Amino acid sequence: MSDAASADLDALRGQADALRARLAAGATDAELAAARALLTALRNARQYDALAQLAEWLSRATPDDAHVRRLYAQALIEQGLLTAAIDVLQPLAARLPAGDPEQAEATGLLGRAFKQVFFDTQDKC
């Protein structure tokens, strides 16, 4: 990884840390929007630990935000925390209407998580 790429990742993680601290202290609407936008950047940069931590705090502030919950679950899956991800995704998929794009994403991630649990299981009988 180049020094520039490493610096970019450090900057992303720094932004996530700063926003997480603001969320813990009670964030403004602008800070909530910035944190929500940063989730996608963290996912795209494959920074799943920072993504999960920021999504945890953002979920506390906006518990009904399906996009945040889905990205949180995706970060959990990427870190191998499959049953935790399933526990986030099942109620999310159940409460969203069938035509909602986040419902389709949540259902797809559920399938991915269950498939990984199956492949991780020693006895497949």
Predicted regions and their residues:
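Amphipathic alpha-helical segments of tetratricopeptide repeats
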Residues: E56, R60, Q90-P97
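Amphipathic alpha-helical repeat scaffolds of TPR domains
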Residues: M1-D10, G14-D17, G26-T40, T62-E78, ...
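Short, charge-rich amphipathic interface segments used for partner binding and complex assembly
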Residues: A41-A45
